[in-house]
Regions:
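Conserved micro-motifs of the catalytic ATP-binding
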Residues: 182-187, 226-229
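Short helix N-cap motif at coil->helix boundaries in the Bergerat
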Residues: 194, 283-291
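PAS-family sensory domains
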Residues: 2-73
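PAS-family sensory/regulatory modules and their coupling/dimerization elements
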Residues: 43-109
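Short alpha-helical segment of the dimerization/phosphotransfer core of two-component systems
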Residues: 162-167
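Conserved catalytic submotifs in the C-terminal HATPase_c
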Residues: 188-191, 210, 215-225, 262
Length: 352
């Protein structure tokens, strides 16, 4: 029995051996991890709400000396999906009667990925369809009653230009997100001057701040430690954070960027640089914060579209920071504003 236990403990998916009465004779470590209430000698009730679906299947398989498989979804709040495979084994050592060997493959991550992909396609379709519908309506109007009206033509052409710009921004952000995700597993290796990257990002948004009547305040420690990073990617992340702060701050408000060495108790747990962008906007309800980095998620959908937002900016920021082995934290107070802080690990010194 000990040798059999060692063998199944080396299998990464949950494995159980059931006797004729469908009691658990043997289970591996992965099974105990997936089903915390599992006990050797207990029945299927220790599998929680799974047992109602598979009890009869197991009995039929044992009676027929055959094999079977079934996919089930649990009734838990956070549903899990399992592919359960069962096979009758005869003359197994230490088991004089026919037994069932059962494996559980957790399909939940694949199920979630499929759902996210479907949602993503639906969102992209909606985001593109809306401006196309608007442009189609403007063209129809220009071809009809407004064709001889210069003022109306100017108005509708301006609106069409705005919708085209919106689609252009959407396609640009989709391409950026796709590129970042494709490179996410490969952490940058080259040292990067954080101060220069911050300076580049500030220069890129200065004109927008002036146009919107916002003040930029900068507090950056000179000669910050180097990180391992890609300048264009990190600059894109900082520009996205700064543009959001500029767009959502109140009229005449101030956007503050600060960058310092992170304290020892920072979320990364090691030497790091933290770059914080603070705005004086309306703030974000606490319940909305966990979803801010989801694709196409907007707290105020109408306002986001009015300022040309695609709903992808913070998703891009998150994936860029993940590639740099960093992370983003968000703090906000309704009525006062928000602070977005990027933490980036400091590059380890090369031994000589």
């Amino acid at each position: 029995m000990k040798n059999q236990q060692k063998v199944i403990d080396g299998i990464s998916v949950p494995v159980m051996v059931l006797d004729n009465d469908l009691h658990i004779s043997l289970a591996n470590k992965a099974a105990f991890k997936s089903f915390p209430e599992l006990e050797t000698g207990a029945g299927l009730e220790k599998l929680g709400d799974i047992d109602r679906d598979i009890d009869q299947l197991f009995r039929d398989t044992l009676a027929n000396r055959g094999s079977a498989s079934v996919t089930i979804v649990t009734d838990e709040t956070f549903q899990r999906e399992f592919l359960i495979s069962v096979k009758t084994v005869v003359d197994l050592k230490d088991f004089p009667e026919p037994t069932l060997v059962v494996t559980f493959e957790d399909q939940t991550p694949l199920r979630v990925a499929k759902s996210m992909r479907s949602d993503f396609v639906a969102n992209v379709s909606h985001e593109i369809r809306s401006p196309l519908t608007a442009i189609s309506g403007f063209v129809e109007t220009l071809q009809g009653d407004a064709s001889d009206d210069p003022d109306a033509s100017k108005l509708f052409l301006g609106l069409m230009e705005k919708e085209v710009a919106r689609m252009t921004n959407l396609v640009s952000d989709l391409l950026s997100l796709s590129k970042v995700e494709a490179k996410e597993r490969r952490a940058p290796k080259n040292p990067l001057d954080v101060n220069q990257t911050i300076h580049q990002s500030i220069e890129s948004v200065s004109a927008l701040a002036d146009k919107r009547g916002k003040t930029l305040e900068i507090d950056v420690t000179p000669n910050l430690p180097s990180i391992r990073g890609k300048r264009d990617d990190l600059a894109r992340a900082l520009i996205n954070l700064l543009e959001n702060a500029i767009n959502y701050s109140r009229d005449g408000g101030t956007v503050r960027l600060s960058a310092h060495s992170a304290p020892a108790d920072n979320p990364l747990g090691g030497a790091a640089v933290c770059i914080a962008v603070n705005d004086e906007g309306e703030g974000i309800p606490a319940a909305e914060i966990p979803r801010l980095t989801e694709r196409f998620y907007r707290v105020d959908k109408s306002r986001s579209r009015n300022i040309g937002g695609t709903g992808l900016g913070l998703a891009i920021v998150k994936h860029i920071l993940v590639r740099h082995r960093g992370l983003l934290t968000i703090e906000s107070t309704v009525g006062k504003g928000s602070t977005f802080t990027a933490y980036l690990p400091v590059a380890a010194l090369q031994k000589t």
